[in-house]
Amino acid sequence: MIRAYEQNPQHFIEDLEKVRVEQLTGHGSSVLEELVQLVKDKNIDISIKYDPRKDSEVFANRVITDDIELLKKILAYFLPEDAILKGGHYDNQLQNGIKRVKEFLESSPNTQWELRAFMAVMHFSLTADRIDDDILKVIVDSMNHHGDARSKLREELAELTAELKIYSVIQAEINKHLSSSGTINIHDKSINLMDKNLYGYTDEEIFKASAEYKILEKMPQTTIQVDGSEKKIVSIKDFLGSENKRTGALGNLKNSYSYNKDNNELSHFATTCSDKSRPLNDLVSQKTTQLSDITSRFNSAIEALNRFIQKYDSVMQRLLDDTR
């Protein structure tokens, strides 16, 4: 006989270790191996932890998913047998329950589980037509919705921030020539915007995986002569004149701009570039605020799930205590 995990998880694990997988109800389940692999792939840790409020005997904390055979026994313990009559009511109910288990494991951001909470959630998922299952579904759906929105915002914000970074590199180069009252060539003697060092990268492979590089590789290129050989660069003019970016193309570009105190075209050029990037800066601020808000909502959904599981565990524990 295997003692209940709700009353003493240490005794439950000890009893499981004494039996073979073949002796457990779900040993022949068609999804047993799949669920074992899913738990491994999601790096889910299931542990038993001594809780003085619940456990009468002290025991050592233990991560039980380190033992694959034990993990298989835990899953086989709560899994029911496959239905004999395929397509019947029981089979449909069972398949829906297993589907909920998979969806929960795949979508839950929580990878650290105490045994009692994990087993409770698994039982929730396998049992149909219960209000606690509906509550869990609402919470998980909320987490998925906000998680997807957060991922999309992060990607968009990374692209916007990268384009703004390229503008800041260009602005710094213009300011350098302004301070020396000089002339900036933005064409064949331009800085190469493909230079990783301009953005603080030291490793070429890391730079090539960056959001800045993904924008720059869509730009046209200028061929220049370096020590008698040809080299392709992305010049300032290439970048500003391209439509392949969020801010679009800047028209009527010259190859160079000079400082002149009477008609300072270099200063005008600096202002034009600044005006071009200003809406982008405003958009970055807006998206950053949105990301902060959606992250807060995502974290609230996780907190709600944890509170629900803790509350359920507390209620179940009181019910179990009353039956002793």
Swiss-Prot record:
InterPro entries for the chain: LowCa_resp_V_Ag, Vir_assoc_V_ag_sf
Transmembrane segments: none
Main localization category: secreted
Disulfide bond entries: none
Protein name: Virulence-associated V antigen
Organism in which the protein naturally occurs: Yersinia pestis (strain Pestoides F)
Compartment(s) where it occurs, according to its Swiss-Prot or TrEMBL record: Secreted
A Pfam family recorded for this sequence: LcrV
Function: Possibly involved in calcium regulation of YOP expression, which includes the export process.
Keyword check for Secreted: yes
Keyword annotations of the record: Plasmid, Secreted, Virulence
Organism taxonomic ancestry: Bacteria, Pseudomonadati, Pseudomonadota, Gammaproteobacteria, Enterobacterales
Keyword Zinc: no
GO cellular component: a single term: extracellular region
